[in-house]
Swiss-Prot record:
InterPro entries: PRC_barrel-like_sf, PRC_RimM, RimM, RimM_N, RimM_N_sf, Transl_B-barrel_sf. Residues 113-194 form the PRC barrel domain. Coiled coil: none annotated. GO terms for molecular function: ribosome binding. Its main location: cytoplasm. This is Ribosome maturation factor RimM. Belongs to the RimM family. One of its GO terms (cellular component) is cytoplasm. The PRC barrel domain binds ribosomal protein uS19. It comes from Leptothrix cholodnii (strain ATCC 51168 / LMG 8142 / SP-6) (Leptothrix discophora (strain SP-6)).
Length: 194
């Protein structure tokens, strides 16, 4: 049996950052993480790359590696820099500009009780204490003091045409009774008419 291609993407990849530009002359590159807490970027040593959306690569650009074996990641000023043996010099680092970085969800650090990664909440159904469906988590909003769940649910507009409604629920203990990841469900103290 042949060994699996090392650059094959795992089924659980999550986009966590993008390459901003080259840094220095030895192949280091600057990274912009999407989350304020970039632990997934710091802990994963296998970064899967995809070219930037809607931007053609120059014909003379070197091929974008599908997988980087990251050897070092560190904070630098208000950003993050990283290096990998697949990126030997500044020219190779410049070729990564705009690349999207994905890591395996399995490589994320474990969270404590009552803590969740947003990626694990997106797609969960939300019901209230009466079992009424409030919608499905489509996104979260960071308001500073706490996060807010953004739910989508089927609705109709003033002409009776089907549309997707939006409901916002603060993700705080006062309104969230339980998060049941195994059942893909959140129970909230929230009415349909709120």
């Amino acid at each position: 049996m042949a060994a699996a291609d090392e650059s094959s993407w795992p089924a659980d990849v999550v986009e966590v950052a993008k390459v901003i530009d080259a840094w220095g002359v030895k192949g280091w590159f600057r990274v912009h993480p999407y989350a304020a807490d970039a632990q997934a970027v710091f802990t994963s040593r296998r970064w899967y790359l995809q070219g930037p959306d809607n931007r053609p690569r120059p014909k003379d650009a070197p091929a974008l590696p599908r997988l980087l074996h990251v050897t070092e990641v560190k904070e630098h000023g208000d950003g993050i820099v990283a290096c990998a043996p697949e990126v030997a010099d500044r020219s190779a680092a410049e070729a990564l500009k705009g690349a999207r970085i994905f890591v395996s969800r399995a490589s994320f650090p474990t969270v404590g009780d009552g803590e969740y990664y947003w990626i694990d909440l997106i797609g969960l159904s939300v019901v209230n204490r009466d079992g009424e469906s409030l919608g499905t988590v489509t996104d979260l909003i960071d308001t500073g003091p706490h996060s807010v769940l953004r739910l989508g649910y089927p609705s109709v507009d003033d002409k009776g045409a089907p549309v997707e409604g939006e409901r916002l629920i603060p993700f705080v203990a006062a309104y969230i009774d339980s998060v049941q990841l195994d059942q893909k469900r959140i129970v909230a103290d929230w009415g349909l008419d709120y």
